[in-house]
Amino acid sequence: TNPFFVTLEGAIREVVESHGDQLISMDPANDSNTQVNQIEDMISRGVEVMFVNPVDADGIIPALDMLKDAGIPMFGFDTQVGDMSYLTSYAGSDNYNAGYVCGEDLAKKVPDGGDILVLDSPTMQSVTDRTNGFLDAIKESGVTFNVVGQQDAQGNQQVANEKATDLL
């Protein structure tokens, strides 16, 4: 379980419950089909509002159509959806810039360059944006870095550790 989402869920739960409401939280385990099924289930349970962090920015669109048809307002966080017009509101960071700042920092700290292994999660738009920002920054830095591999870590630290170990 991602510590970011554990903290975020706790904060949302605290606010929701302080108003006498109930928060139902589901983990799609980085599976877009599971997430769509979970949203269908929430609609059938009669939820009044939906907080959405898509596994796949475009893969979630059918579920957003269902939410829209059901008249359920949608609030996005952290990762944008493929069509932001579905959302009532969105709160998230500038993931591209966050990656760019990391790339700039690496170039300053490792001025001789080196080999880099990128562990990403291509279906997660927030991760893709951070990766692109990072790669653009190191390219523009003038420092020579070689991307020797790029693997899908599926947004999972254990998978990332295993892939890094295998590739090293």
Model-based region annotation:
Residues 1-168:
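A residue-level marker of the well-folded mature domains of exported/periplasmic proteins
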